[in-house]
Amino acid sequence: MKQTDGAKKQLELLLQRYPILAGQRDEIDGAYQIIAASYEAGGKLLIAGNGGSAADAEHIVGELMKGFKKTRRLDEALAERLLRESPELGPDLVQHLQKALPAIAMDGHPALTTAYANDCAPLMCFAQQVNGYGRAGDVLLVISTSGKSKNILYAAVTARALGMKVVGLTGGADSPLLPLLVDQEVYPENLAQLGRNEARSEERRVGKECRS
């Protein structure tokens, strides 16, 4: 997929703000290409992370499921159908609804996750959701600083078995996630070995989400 001018501009701005990521230009662009291609084909994005990474997952979903830098207007065809369906309520829906990029953060759904954790296997809650939500052509985005979280690894294996692509935000060349990824963004430091850099990993990730 050809990168749009807008995407190119955002990538350049990101690298200007965070020069340390310059060595990961191809990985960042590759992740964009994979996710964008899935959306164009009617796919969706599932996101998994623990702790601060779970907060990142929720943040990403919040930006994808509504307008972010631009308001995403509804397709005219849908707007017309809404107006036909309800002349009374349709105008409000047309005014306020926005096009969404389907995304699900799997750290939520407490009834499902606690039931599955209690009845089955706590570390496979993400994998169970991938099994239920995922379809071939969808993308799983996994966020793990160390890449060693078992619940993340279980989810990645399940996604691959379903024919999904797996993109990871992880750290360090020894991250166990790497063999499971079609593309990855590996920070310059080996974050799995240098625990002091975990905060820097989180800082860069949050910075990219908030400012790009």
Label each PLM-derived region with a short phrase:
Residues 156-160:
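Surface-exposed amphipathic alpha-helices with a cationic face
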Residues 23-41:
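A short, well-structured juxtamembrane/interface segment
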Residues 1-23:
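Generic N-terminal amphipathic, Lys/Arg-enriched alpha-helix
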Residues 203-210:
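Conserved small/polar residues in nucleotide/adenosyl-binding loops
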Residues 37-133:
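Glycine-rich, small/polar surface segments that engage phosphate groups of diverse ligands
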